Every structure is written in structure tokens, then in C-alpha cells.
């Protein structure tokens, strides 16, 4: 984590911008006393919604609460979906989305914070089948069923890289790994961080396949409306959270 901290510190120093005199989203958040956070609630360990209680939990939920505390405001979670995330940000349904993969298409719509996690797409499969699906060539064969949640970077990766395999779109990302465990699909290609977590939830049943050597490079960051003042605050807060140990403590809670 120290190497990541140094990288974030350097990037923060290069990107900090002064707050605008008036009319910034940061000012609006402080004036309304509420930070609105967009979250899908279906991406453990980053965000998960308990449908019984209506409560959210996860690493990015804890980080969002820490950000709201730093701002001196309360927090309101705005439910969204992966397919509706960009529209929600563009239309102002929320101020910031937590735990989002950095892409250039998303950069066109809003600002990203300094990245806080290196990631990448890698397979997860039943442990008995893990040797079958080591490479994209192994996976991209007729008859192989690759399950994906709709509208996010997982489905986009599959459709860009797989041409012979059968891509099965499943709408509920909270139960999608149960579909995999029960044999309704052969594998899923998702973020390495998620494969590690799901393998721990399904010991001996699901196995993360080479999560330390994913198929591509990706980073997680916080995605916000394009306001320089808000970005400067978020980057400064993240920098301090990494340096004072708050980030590491929350990361250990959810990932170790």
C-alpha cells in the first residue's frame, strides 16, 4: 500500500486545482449539508445493499461516509445501476460515485479522483474447472458460457474480447456467483479484486484464476461531477486518508 500511497500523493500534487469563487458543486454540497453518493449496491466487497434493511455496506460505503464526515455533511445514497451510472452522473442524480473503474468514456462525463486501487479483468470459475480457463483462447470457444452483469465494464470486456464463447447476461450482480457455483455458467470475467473476495465467500467451490496477472490493466477511483473544487477536495481527503492510516484500516477490514 505504501507504493500506492506515494503514487496517489504525486498525482494529487499534480492535479489539485483551486476552488472556484462561487457556484461550485463543492459549495452546493456544503450549503445543502448532504453528499449524494451514487452506488449500485451489488458489487461486493465495495458496495452491497441489504434489501431487508435497506442498509448499504462495503469498503466504498465506508469511504463515502468518511468523505462526508470530512466535508462536515450528512450522506444520502442514491441507488443506480451500472448501465445507468453515466446518465445519473450527467443528470446530477448524485455528486459522486464510489468504486468505479477508470475509463476514457467516463472521463468525458466527469472527473476521476486520484486512483486508489490497481485492478484488471480476470476469470473466476468453479475450482474443478479452473485449469480449463487460463487464457482468453481457452475461454473463447464454442460451448463455453461466460456470465456477465449488464451494462458495465465486465460485459464490455466480454463483447470486445470474446467472439465464439456464449455470453450470458444475468441481471442480478448480487446472486450472479451463485449461478456460476451451481453450474448455470462456466465462468465470469470480472475485476481481480472481486474474484478474490468471491473465492473467499465460496471456499473450495469458486476459484479466482491468476488474479495477480489479469488480462488487462484497470484502476479504481471516485467519479464525480466535473467540478475542479470538488475534485481538489476529494484528492486531498484521499491523500490524507492514505497517509494517516484510515484508508489502510478500512481496506484491511474488507479485503484481508
Question: Positions of the model-derived regions?
Answer:
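Bacterial N-terminal signal peptides
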Residues: 5-15
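Extracytoplasmic small-molecule ligand-binding "clamshell" domains
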Residues: 21-100, 108
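Ligand-binding clefts/hinges and TM-proximal coupling segments of bilobed small-molecule sensing domains
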Residues: 22-24, 153-170, 207-211, 238-256
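Short helix-initiation/N-cap motifs at beta->coil->alpha
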Residues: 61, 77-87, 168-182, 216-218
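Extended ligand-binding regions for polar small-molecule ligands
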Residues: 61-70, 128-129, 137-143, 152, ...
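A conserved helix-loop-strand patch within extracytoplasmic ligand-binding domains
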Residues: 73-84, 101-106, 114-155, 159-161
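A ligand-binding cleft/hinge motif common to bilobed small-molecule-binding domains
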Residues: 84-87, 101-109, 157-160, 181-216
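Periplasmic-binding protein-like
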Residues: 106, 118-125, 192, 196-239, ...
Amino acid at each position: 500500500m505504501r507504493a500506492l500511497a506515494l503514487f496517489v500523493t504525486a498525482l494529487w500534487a499534480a492535479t489539485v486545482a483551486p476552488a472556484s469563487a462561487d457556484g461550485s458543486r463543492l459549495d452546493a454540497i456544503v450549503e445543502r449539508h448532504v453528499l449524494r453518493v451514487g452506488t449500485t449496491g451489488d458489487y461486493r466487497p465495495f458496495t452491497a445493499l441489504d434489501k431487508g434493511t435497506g442498509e448499504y455496506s462495503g469498503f466504498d460505503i465506508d469511504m463515502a461516509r468518511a468523505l462526508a464526515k470530512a466535508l462536515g455533511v450528512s450522506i444520502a445514497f442514491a441507488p443506480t445501476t451500472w448501465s445507468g451510472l453515466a446518465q445519473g452522473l450527467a443528470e446530477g442524480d448524485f455528486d459522486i460515485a464510489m468504486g468505479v473503474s477508470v475509463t476514457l468514456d467516463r472521463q468525458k462525463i466527469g472527473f476521476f479522483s486520484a486512483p486508489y486501487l490497481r485492478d484488471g479483468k480476470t476469470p473466476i470459475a468453479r475450482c474443478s474447472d479452473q485449469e480449463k480457463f487460463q487464457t482468453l483462447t481457452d475461454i473463447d470457444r464454442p460451448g463455453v458460457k461466460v456470465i456477465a452483469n449488464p451494462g458495465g465494464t465486465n460485459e464490455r470486456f466480454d463483447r470486445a474480447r470474446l467472439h465464439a464463447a456464449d455470453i450470458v447476461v444475468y441481471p442480478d450482480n448480487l446472486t450472479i456467483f451463485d449461478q456460476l457455483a451451481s453450474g448455470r455458467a462456466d465462468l465470469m470475467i470480472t475485476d481481480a479484486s472481486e474474484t478474490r473476495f468471491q473465492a473467499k465467500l465460496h471456499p473450495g467451490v469458486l476459484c479466482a484464476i491468476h488474479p495477480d496477472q489479469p488480462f488487462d490493466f484497470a484502476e479504481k477511483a471516485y467519479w464525480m461531477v466535473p467540478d475542479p473544487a470538488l475534485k481538489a477536495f476529494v484528492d486531498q481527503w484521499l491523500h490524507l486518508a492514505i497517509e494517516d492510516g484510515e484508508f489502510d484500516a478500512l481496506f484491511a477490514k474488507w479485503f484481508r
